[in-house]
Amino acid sequence: MKLEGGCYCGALRYVVDGEPMLKAQCHCRECQYITGGAPNMFMVMPGDTFRYTKGTAKQFTRTDIANPVTREFCPECGTHVMTRPPRGVAVVKVGTLDDPKAYGAPTLAIFTCDKQPFHHVPEGIPAFERRPT
């Protein structure tokens, strides 16, 4: 599956090729900051299948939390495009896909301990208070 996407202003473009390893939603507070309050819808892809085709992403890694990840975003408009955890995968933000319908639906929800009353977890998918190991 070849997917293309980019940021809001168009300065950053990417392509990712392969099958998603996971399609999920995250309700953690860190993701709520990034999304403006909503759960974060994402796909985990093999890290070597993601590449930028236009522009250079700015990176940010928090140093004051356990298990930090590197977040990549457009230096012009600030759109959060993807996250790089230490384990060598690319966590692609669904809203940045040219065709978000290609995502389908999440197969699980994580960090529901931080879920807000206005967040929706689809019926029938596994939900975890933290990240499953």
Question: Model features per residue range: what roles?
Answer:
Residues 1-6, 11-133:
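A short Gly-Trp-Pro
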